[in-house]
Amino acid sequence: MSKFFIDRPIFAWVIALVIMLVGALSILKLPINQYPSIAPPAIAIAVTYPGASAQTVQDTVVQVIEQQLNGIDNLRYVSSESNSDGSMTITATFEQGTNPDTAQVQVQNKLNLATPLLPQEVQQQGIRVTKAVKNFLLVIGLVSEDGSMTKDDLANYIVSNMQDPISRTAGVGDFQVFGAQYAMRIWLDPAKLNKFQLTPVDVKTAVAAQNVQVSSGQLGGLPALPGTQLNATIIGKTRLQTAEQFESILLKVNKDGSQVRLGDVAQVGLGGENYAVSAQFNGKPASGLAVKLATGANALDTAKALRETIKGLEPFFPPGVKAVFPYDTTPVVTESISGVIHTLIEAVVLVFLVMYLFLQNFRATIITTMTVPVVLLGTFGILAAAGFSINTLTMFAMVLAIGLLVDDAIVVVENVERVMSEEGLPPKEATKRSMEQIQGALVGIALVLSAVLLPMAFFGGSTGVIYRQFSITIVSAMGLSVLVALIFTPALCATMLKPLKKGEHHTAKGGFFGWFNRNFDRSVNGYERSVGTILRNKVPFLLGYALIVVGMIWLFARIPTAFLPEEDQGVLFAQVQTPAGSSAERTQVVVDQMREYLLKDEADTVSSVFTVNGFNFAGRGQSSGMAFIMLKPWDERSKENSVFALAQRAQQHFFTFRDAMVFAFAPPAVLELGNATGFDVFLQDRGGVGHAKLMEARNQFLAKAAQSKILSAVRPNGLNDEPQYQLTIDDERASALGVTIADINNTLSIALGASYVNDFIDRGRVKKVYIQGEPSARMSPEDLQKWYVRNGAGEMVPFSSFAKGEWTYGSPKLSRYNGVEAMEILGAPAPGYSTGEAMAEVERIAGELPSGIGFSWTGMSYEEKLSGSQMPALFALSVLFVFLCLAALYESWSIPIAVVLVVPLGIIGALIATSLRGLSNDVYFLVGLLTTIGLAAKNAILIVEFAKELHEQGRSLYDAAIEACRMRLRPIIMTSLAFILGVVPLTIASGAGAGSQHAIGTGVIGGMISATVLAIFWVPLFFVAVSSLFGSKEPEKDVTPENPRYEAGQ
């Protein structure tokens, strides 16, 4: 094939140009992400049961729906949360690769079976089924800079004017408003109700009857009488629109003709639909809308579309109102991709310099460099065809591929120049002769590297997604690299290289190149003597190799494990939890103290603080608070002001707060997999021991975790049990008094729980009507005595006649995991420890808990456990594939052993480098390790291929091995050094995405250094030992190790 294109160079140019054109067009179409869709698809079910407790929601809603979800295809696990405000969320997580649309349809079908079994109030509120991920993409805030609007005004404006266009934006999966729109609030006065012998049920019935929209029909509607000349629509009663209209609702007409209207027994006016959440931006009144990304949507495209939507709405904002983005996860995407692109450019420059140093021929260097854009652009074309995106993983793979793809071109150019020098052939003939020699080695290298990396593409789970990005990208680049080396590079060599006189290869004697050549030649001579010594003393060096293998195994066992390295995402969370039963006012004091510290003491690091009272990731309630902290851009912060340093300083300060627990934590590397770094585990009541015992086990776990030196920031992702007032109805007493249980329950629900009646029209938008007791009538248990129920005789009976209560404790938030009650616990490894070590410690502590209490990993921890179990199989498959490919290539079962034996020599270096830098055995490390295995095997192939040919030509095993080493040392050193320097920018990167770059770069550089330095000495030993062991025949005229050429180093 190469000969065809050597004779037709323009044909080769056309192919290269077409490849580049296709790649350039693909770049314009490829989406840009920080990561591909790593998180498994998740379908969320959201329900509201007004006035219900967390236990009531769990018993009457959650369990009913959960029981129907069984049997859905590819369902991985189900988790649920029930809150004391009546809200509930069930999240069904599916196996990676499941079509989210199909999953949503199946969930909806199962939900249809459960809906008739749910309380009527729940069905009336509606059930939402959405495709969503755990984390927020960004938060859109409205802030009143002049203080002219309250938080309730801003929340109403968001819901009324911004929520709909934002929810329609492509890529938006779900959203959460920090606040609520206006509602018509009817505040009942129990004393006035009793005075007029009315009950809350009477009021609700009257409002429902008189606030209606009537369809009154038409005059002259069809079918009509003959001769009808008029057709007109009849406008009947419409929904009420103002507080005055509601105040005029007639409740009662007395015998004397006097009337009791709603305004006589209640205060009516616009108010918040609920008052659970309030927000501030840098201390100013604000409201916000947190957006979640739809499953499979592109983060950058969605964020861009949302900003354009807000830009279109801004001209219509009220005076003094400004839109802000107090939390945004997309800047890290653009910064990290930009950083990797810079790394890519730096890698190309460094590789060019290394090639020029060794080739010492500008034309030869240009030839090898010209292959880079062809292969890289061609790879983008393959990524587009495979449905991939431009993301951190594919760009990392491109950086690794640079060193690999120039290897093939270097081997071609180097060998062409060697043939011209040794045989005195002109460039065209030398190229043909050279390609006959190295074509097999090039194909072999491509097969081996593909064999190492392709098994990664077949693994499942989130780890499999990461592996596939690397695998397909590098294998595609390698495949194109070999094609270019067989098609384009020979054509360039035949037409661009100048002829060399015999013996002129690398003969520069003056200047820097002369100094370099002299020293390199001396090194080659010393290297030949060393190889000769090793081949004469095989046993000690084979024992040394065995020690290396033992050391590799020992290091593998000691290096800490993790899933992904931590990243500075430019954002930080702070979570506030005041004592159980605390009021919102008490929580706000702590939130204000936290905000003041961040904005004043950390002004060099923090850009803005958006605080929310009434909500955090652990749950909702008056004792909960949250802060979304945006940091300044990476180039404005030093390492001392990284998100991790800030979190550590802030946590130390928050420990001084006596009236609350405050945790500062960074988001995880992959935001789709959760809201915090570290581990995520559920303690489960598998033995049915009950809530109290589960709470005791949780507290026991937290106490032991606090004593562990391996764990830090261990906290429940839930709320502590808080005071609850248990109201007991004496059914017999109530019956004797003529009061029905239905009237009692309805009165309680309306007076204390805020009962939804129906809707009204406010400025052209449909909003809700709520009835509730006025605040002064529901502040303490004694206020229950103010409420009355009418009996069958028309008498007003106070609650104290048939009800009594007592204080108990209960949870404001209940969680379930895979069908059993559970409690979620979050935490992080202590400084100096990895998540793998932290998870092992969690398993140890969980094993000491009372019987009946189990645990299950979830989120990123689930993926980490899955990836750890896959690693041995991945390595075994990769090594097996390498062996089989080499066996097919060499038609030998023994020769491949000499190549495979080099693998530990690369792994040991990767382990040492990773350990010395304090990094972990994570997914990136494993990708780098597999790359190192392929490169180590590549170096071995370059020696073994030539040694095998020389031996078949009649050389002894010893002579063939040493001659192959001498011939291939320069290209091995050159390609290895080019690859190492190409990866150096990854190891010294800073800013966004630096953690990932360090993780992959450190292991690869360490592995390549050891694979190069050690392999050039051990590979000839492996070749000779394996060939001797399996009975390779020596030629009759043997050249013994005592031959003087070994001593002369020739």
UniProtKB/Swiss-Prot annotation:
Inducing stimuli: The arpABC operon was not seen to be induced by carbenicillin, chloramphenicol, erythromycin nor by hexane, toluene or p-xylene.
Q: Where are the transmembrane segments?
A: 10-30, 339-359, 370-390, 393-413, 440-460, 472-492, 539-559, 871-891, 893-913, 923-943, 972-992, 1004-1024
Q: What does this protein do?
A: The inner membrane transporter component of an antibiotic efflux pump. Confers resistance to numerous structurally unrelated antibiotics such as carbenicillin, chloramphenicol, erythromycin, novobiocin, streptomycin and tetracycline. Is not involved in organic solvent efflux.
GO function terms (MF aspect): efflux transmembrane transporter activity; xenobiotic transmembrane transporter activity
Q: Which UniProt keywords apply?
A: Antibiotic resistance, Cell inner membrane, Cell membrane, Membrane, Transmembrane, Transmembrane helix, Transport
Where would you find this protein in the cell? Cell inner membrane
The coiled-coil segments of this chain are: none
* Primary localisation category: membrane
Q: Which family does it belong to?
A: Belongs to the resistance-nodulation-cell division (RND) (TC 2.A.6) family.
Q: Which InterPro entries match?
A: AcrB_DN_DC_subdom, Acrflvin-R, MdtF-like
Q: Which Pfam families match?
A: ACR_tran
Q: What is this protein called?
A: Antibiotic efflux pump membrane transporter ArpB
Write down the membrane topology. Multi-pass membrane protein
Q: Which gene encodes it?
A: arpB
Q: Which GO terms describe its biological process?
A: response to antibiotic
Q: Which GO terms describe its cellular component?
A: plasma membrane
